[in-house]
UniProtKB/Swiss-Prot annotation:
Cell compartments where the protein resides: Mitochondrion
Protein name according to UniProt: Small ribosomal subunit protein bS6m
GO annotation, biological process: mitochondrial translation
GO terms assigned for molecular function: small ribosomal subunit rRNA binding; structural constituent of ribosome
Organism the protein comes from: Bos taurus
Annotated GO CC locations: mitochondrial inner membrane; mitochondrial small ribosomal subunit
Keywords: Mitochondrion, Ribonucleoprotein, Ribosomal protein
Principal subcellular localisation of the protein: mitochondrion
Subunit composition and interactions: Component of the mitochondrial ribosome small subunit (28S) which comprises a 12S rRNA and about 30 distinct proteins.
Family affiliation: Belongs to the bacterial ribosomal protein bS6 family.
InterPro entries: Ribosomal_bS6, Ribosomal_bS6_sf, Transl_elong_EF1B/ribsomal_bS6
This protein's encoding gene: MRPS6
Keyword Ribosomal protein listed: yes
Length: 124
């Protein structure tokens, strides 16, 4: 299963309502076969511009980041479910960048200058 990140903006609510909305969201992910790795609260802040969702205009929102594994076939279903949730302003699922170690390219090892000179002298 590939790894995904769900960037989620919830409408500004009190702590119990926010917890209930997050619980609903995570249960929806797990019901569709996802394995949740982590949930990160990025805080509540003013939105960069007024956003409309479910016939309401929002100026503040809570930002959350969910890291999860899921089958590729369920991502569309997850997005459809989240777009219908009245507490969600913006859901956005992106494939997690690969976290492999970056190896330094060995490339072509430069030949020492002396060997290069000797090899050219022998040819003549």
């Amino acid at each position: 299963m590939p790894r995904y990140e769900l960037a989620l903006i919830l409408k500004a609510m009190q702590r119990p309502e926010t917890a209930a909305a997050l619980k609903r969201t995570l249960e929806a992910l797990m019901d569709r076969g996802a394995v949740v790795r982590s949930l990160e609260n990025l805080g509540e802040r003013t939105l960069p511009y007024k956003m409309s969702a479910h016939s309401q205009r929002h100026t503040r929102g809570g930002y959350f980041l969910v890291d999860f594994y899921a089958p590729t076939t369920t991502v569309a279903s997850i997005m459809e479910h989240l777009s219908r949730d009245i507490d969600v302003i913006r859901p956005n699922v992106v494939k997690h960048p690969l976290t492999q170690e970056v190896k330094e390219c060995e490339g072509i090892v430069p030949v020492p200058l002396e060997e290069k000179l000797y090899s050219t002298k022998k040819r003549k």
